[in-house]
């Protein structure tokens, strides 16, 4: 029973399990079918998209091919039109040539008739006249212009272009015919060595406009179908109609004449361009030769000296060589319509880097010029440096020269010419390039011209030294003018003699600079001694020795270059006090020269001296001395007549000069800068305050001076020695007492006393704000003043402990400074009488 029950249970469960598995299987099949169907649909859509893309590509290719085909058709049609126009023009020209040949033949016939008539009249006059000489002179019309009797070879006239004959007949009826014009206007089958054809044609045209006695019996008859020749048969009885016929013939040839003359002029301009390019390539090849000699002479030079020449130079040389070959091929095989614009269009194209390399050359040139100056100065060969400057200048000027040449070619090019548009584009490109880099061009040109002038002056200085040594050896008197033999011996170019130094006003001291050369040590010693402070006679002697016109920007060139660099720091140091003794009758010119002498001794210090020195504050105006030492005439010379360079023995009179630090003084743009006369930098600058006052009065901007300055004596005392007034350079003058207190806190009581003393002396108005920071230059100046106080007597240092200012009136009531001031000058001057001493600025 149990077995049967289990079998029945299994049978009952079997139909229940089978449908579920079938359902699962069906669901799996359905999902598989669904995924396969979606994949098939995706593949189908992908195929459809690919077909669409292919169809679009095919359509685009078809459109592009159709456009190209239409363009080709249009170009072919345009080419056909051009060919048809050219054929029509050729046919018109050939027809005109045939007409002109016919006219020339008719002219030959008429001339033969005329010559026969002239010969007949000549024979008649010879028979009836007793003097054969005058009869011959009057009979032939060719005798007056020295033309031989015409022999008419008709085969030469048939090939002659009509434009030559009529152009020559219109311009001048003379024998002077240029060979170039004859060759340029002849046809291909013409022999240019047949002057009979020209002479015959000229004589026949001159015979047409002669007087009535030589009129021909008849003229040629023009065919009825001619457009420009409509005159009828002209007889001997109608001379007016003969003249009109001649004018009609000349007017008909204007077009041919104009075209031929323009072509000839255009060819000559192209030849000029080729010749200039040939010379230019020769010049720049010389630069490469000089570069090779510089690099080969010394292999141990550093990289800076090896870059004496711009790196783009070799590329530019190659480009100009290619251009020269192309121009030779074009110009020497010049066709009827020569084309040059495509060469320059390719040269100035953006793909070609010619203009970029040219700009790189212009930018590298100033540094290369400075290196050339240093290296050649070291080697001592100035002729090579002169040649290098000249060749550099040629390269700078080449692009403007191209513009001029192309404009000349464009001037003689018609608008219908195929080269017209190309030349127009090239000219426009060059104009834009030159206008864009005008400043670069101008800077390089000015630099090269300036270097060339300085080189000529230095070579003239060497020439003078050589002449002086020759004169010293020969025992003869030195002469400032150089002979040709001396010039030849010294190796100076003849063109450099054209710009010598002008002679000095006084003939005696003018020859003092013609001195034999000495050793370097002696030159250095003499130069340094000349820069040290001395007597006025020494300064005057040096001023006369190095005297030159003030218009020259370059300083004297008589010092060696190494000494010039070493001697630069001499005049820029602090200048101590000096005791000058000069007579009151010293002329103003000597004083001016003595004041100008130390600045004249400075060599070319443009690269070593900063662009502006420390300002002078005076009367609301600020004066500054620029670096190139700009000379200015004295504003009021009468103020200097009573001035003496003698110095008082006061330790308060200090005149020193320090250059401005740009890093420190760059934040002061509110002060206007005005040039100060050069004598303010000299050791003998005792009258510099007078110069400031004179300049301010001349400009009409000077404020009223203080009472103490007005009380200063202008005339010298009885003993002939006047106290000297220096221009104070103390930056602490004219400031608030806060400035002095700040200086006292920073540098101690001694510096505070010195700063306060400087503040009491000054009469300048307050220019700067109190919140302005103390610069490094002011700190150094106060330290310098602090050093000077160590040499003062003990009583003076004790009296300086009392700080005061002219803006604080309470200090004046105490009288501490006045008493110490009196004690100081009583002790130093030995004033035993006890008189009240009046300082250089009067009582405060």
Swiss-Prot record:
Q: Name positions with the PTM Omega-N-methylarginine.
A: 757
Q: Which residues form a coiled coil?
A: 54-129
Which molecular function GO terms apply here? guanyl-nucleotide exchange factor activity
What InterPro entries does the database record attribute to this sequence?
A: ARHGEF33, DBL_dom_sf, DH_dom
Question: DH domain: which residues?
Answer: 265-440
Record has Coiled coil as a keyword: yes
Composition skew (Basic and acidic residues), residue ranges: 1-13, 101-113, 787-800
Show the ranges annotated as biased composition (Polar residues): 130-142
The protein's matches in Gene3D superfamilies, at most eight in alphabetical order, are given as: Dbl homology (DH) domain
Could you tell me which SUPFAM superfamilies the record lists for this protein?
DBL homology domain (DH-domain)
Q: Where is this region: Disordered?
A: 1-20, 101-142, 169-189, 498-541, 668-687, 702-745, 787-844
Biased composition of type Basic residues is found at: 820-829
| Entry keywords, A to Z | Coiled coil, Guanine-nucleotide releasing factor, Methylation
Keyword Coiled coil appears in the UniProt entry: yes
Stated role = May act as a guanine-nucleotide releasing factor.
Report the protein name in the record.
Rho guanine nucleotide exchange factor 33
């Amino acid at each position: 029973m149990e077995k049967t029950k289990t079998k029945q249970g299994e049978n009952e469960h079997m139909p229940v399990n089978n449908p579920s598995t079938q359902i699962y299987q069906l669901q799996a099949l359905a999902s598989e079918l669904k995924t396969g169907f979606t994949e098939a649909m995706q593949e189908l859509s992908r195929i459809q998209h690919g077909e669409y893309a292919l169809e679009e590509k095919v359509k685009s290719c078809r459109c592009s091919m159709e456009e190209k085909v239409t363009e080709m058709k249009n170009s072919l049609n345009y080419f056909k039109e051009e060919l048809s126009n050219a054929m029509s023009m050729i046919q018109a020209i050939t027809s005109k040539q045939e007409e002109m040949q016919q006219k020339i033949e008719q002219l030959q016939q008429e001339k033969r008739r005329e010559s026969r008539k002239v010969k007949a009249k000549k024979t008649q006059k010879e028979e009836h006249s007793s003097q054969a000489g005058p009869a011959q002179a009057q009979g032939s019309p060719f005798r007056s212009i020295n033309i031989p009797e015409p022999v008419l070879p008709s085969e030469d006239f048939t090939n002659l272009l009509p434009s030559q004959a009529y152009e020559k007949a219109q311009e001048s009826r003379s024998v002077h015919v240029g060979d170039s014009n004859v060759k340029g206007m002849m046809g291909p089958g013409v022999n240019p060595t047949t002057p009979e054809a020209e002479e015959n044609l000229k004589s026949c045209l001159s015979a047409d406009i002669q007087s009535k006695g030589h009129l021909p019996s008849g003229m040629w008859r023009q065919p009825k179908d001619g457009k420009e020749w409509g005159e009828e048969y002209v007889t001997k009885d109608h001379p007016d109609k003969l003249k009109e016929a001649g004018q009609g013939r000349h007017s008909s040839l204007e077009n041919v004449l104009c075209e031929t003359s323009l072509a000839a002029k255009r060819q000559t301009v192209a030849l000029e361009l080729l010749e200039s390019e040939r010379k230019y390539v020769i010049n720049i090849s010389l630069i490469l030769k000089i570069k090779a000699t510089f690099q080969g002479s010394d292999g141990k030079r550093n990289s800076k000296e090896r870059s004496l020449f711009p790196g783009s130079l070799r590329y530019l040389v190659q480009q100009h060589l290619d251009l020269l070959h192309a121009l030779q091929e074009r110009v020497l095989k010049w066709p009827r319509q020569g084309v040059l614009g495509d060469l320059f269009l390719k040269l100035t194209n953006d793909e070609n880097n010619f203009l970029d390399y040219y700009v790189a050359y212009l930018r590298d040139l100033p540094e290369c010029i400075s290196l050339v100056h240093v290296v050649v100065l070291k080697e001592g060969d100035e002729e090579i440096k002169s040649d290098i400057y000249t060749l550099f200048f040629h390269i700078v000027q080449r692009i403007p020269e191209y513009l001029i040449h192309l404009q000349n070619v464009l001037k003689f090019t018609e608008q219908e010419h195929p080269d017209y548009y190309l030349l127009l584009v090239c000219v426009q490109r060059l104009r834009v390039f030159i206008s864009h880099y005008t400043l670069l061009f101008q800077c390089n040109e000015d630099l090269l011209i300036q270097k060339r002038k300085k080189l000529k002056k230095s070579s003239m200085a060497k020439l003078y030294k050589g002449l002086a040594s020759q004169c010293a050896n020969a025992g003869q008197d030195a002469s400032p003018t150089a002979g040709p033999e001396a010039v030849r011996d010294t190796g100076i170019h003849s063109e450099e003699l054209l710009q010598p130094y002008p002679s000095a006003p006084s003939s005696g001291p003018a020859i003092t600079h013609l001195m034999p050369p000495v050793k370097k040590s002696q030159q250095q010693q003499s130069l340094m001694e000349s820069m040290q402070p001395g007597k006025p006679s020494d300064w005057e002697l040096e001023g006369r020795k190095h005297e030159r016109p003030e218009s020259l920007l370059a300083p004297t060139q008589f010092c060696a270059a190494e000494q010039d660099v070493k001697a630069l720091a001499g005049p820029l140091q602090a200048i101590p006090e000096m005791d000058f003794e000069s007579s009151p009758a010293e002329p103003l010119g000597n004083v001016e020269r003595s004041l100008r002498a130390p600045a004249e001794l400075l060599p070319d210090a443009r690269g070593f001296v900063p662009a502006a020195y420390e300002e002078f504050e005076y009367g609301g105006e600020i004066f500054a001395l620029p670096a190139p030492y700009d000379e200015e005439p004295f504003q009021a010379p009468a103020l200097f007549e009573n001035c003496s360079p003698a110095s008082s023995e006061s330790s308060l009179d200090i005149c020193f000069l320090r250059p401005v630090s740009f890093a420190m003084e760059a934040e002061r743009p509110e002060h206007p800068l005005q040039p100060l006369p050069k004598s303010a930098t000299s050791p003998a600058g005792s009258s510099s305050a007078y110069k400031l006052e004179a300049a301010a009065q001349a400009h009409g901007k000077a404020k009223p001076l203080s009472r103490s300055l007005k009380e200063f004596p202008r005339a010298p005392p009885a003993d002939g020695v006047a106290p000297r007034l220096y221009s104070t350079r103390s930056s602490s003058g004219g400031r608030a007492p806060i400035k002095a207190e700040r200086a006292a806190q920073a540098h101690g009581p001694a510096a505070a006393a010195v700063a306060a003393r400087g503040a009491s002396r000054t009469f300048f108005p307050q220019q700067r704000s109190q919140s302005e920071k103390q610069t490094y230059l002011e700190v150094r100046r106060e330290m310098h003043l602090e050093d000077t106080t160590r040499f003062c007597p003990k009583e003076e240092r004790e009296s300086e402990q009392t700080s005061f200012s002219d803006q604080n009136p309470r200090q004046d009531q105490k009288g501490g400074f006045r008493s110490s001031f009196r004690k100081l000058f009583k002790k130093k001057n030995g004033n035993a009488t006890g008189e009240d001493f009046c300082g250089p600025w009067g009582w405060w």
